[in-house]
Amino acid sequence: RTVASNVYKRAPFRFRTFPATGTDCSFVILNDIHGRADDMTELCREINFGKHDFVMLNGDMSNSIENEEQLFRDFIDASVNLYASETPILYNRGNHETRGVFADRLHDYFPTRSGRHYQLCKVGSVCFLLLDCGEDKPDTDIEYGGLADYDAYRREECEWLRRAVASETFRNASARVVFLHIPLDGGTWHGSNHLRNLFLPILNEAGINIMFSGHTHRYGFHPANDEVRFPVVVNGNQSYIRCDMTGDRIAIRIVGLR
């Protein structure tokens, strides 16, 4: 005798690994959610994530990281419900993710091959640099309690960046895209100045096609000029960026709640 009942079932999750060749690539960028998971869900409800190679979380998804439960509540649970079961996440740390008693554990949830928060990755023949901004204030600021050393950290990252852009993988890429949470737009805060002084001379000589940033909570576009030799797109905290790269064309669409 066979006994059966209605049981839960669904198709297995599927995902695509990044292609080894090809110049076409499509992705979505979110940043500065600051724990507003409901807002992120509403913002993304019209996106067909299955059409994109990955979702870039470009910093400040949380205000600070105090425990695992908060990390999931802030954005991970919503990301899984929206797309992350089948569409890969690339995570780029912002200045707020350096804060909180659980901040050192962030890498456990978004590991990289390099073991660092910054990395170089490749989708087809397109190279992506994910650069870690560190904190935006001086290491001596009272809120860090003498525990921060981001100036030394950025200097170490700078030496890695110098090697990364000199690599054959990067030099032979069909396009070169940079993600950096704090934009290199001439801001007066210590972190922005330090990033600009260290990274900009290297990036200006690296053939960068475009940089994507956040941090300011408002949209901005900075065309290439004599100081920054590549365009910079700054996404706000109430919008997402859709980027479609095809051959020698980069098409960007910014969609916001308001």
Per-segment meaning from a language model:
Residues 24, 52, 86, 172-175, ...:
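A general structural motif
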Residues 23-101:
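Conserved, compact domain cores that house catalytic/ligand-binding motifs in diverse enzymes
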Residues 34-38, 66, 148-155, 193:
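Soluble non-cytosolic domains of exported or imported proteins
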Residues 144-146, 150, 168-210:
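Active-site-proximal segments of metal-dependent phosphoesterases and phosphodiesterases across multiple
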Residues 33-36, 61-64, 95-99, 134-137, ...:
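Solvent-exposed loop/turn segments at secondary-structure junctions
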Residues 1-14, 69-166, 198-204, 220-246:
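Extended active-site neighborhood of metal-dependent phosphoesterases/phosphodiesterases
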Residues 1-29, 49, 246-258:
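Acidic, histidine-bearing metal-coordination/catalytic regions of metal-dependent phosphoesterases
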Residues 28-32, 54-60, 87-95, 177-181, ...:
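Active-site neighborhood of phospho(di)ester-bond hydrolases with catalytic His/Asp-centered motifs
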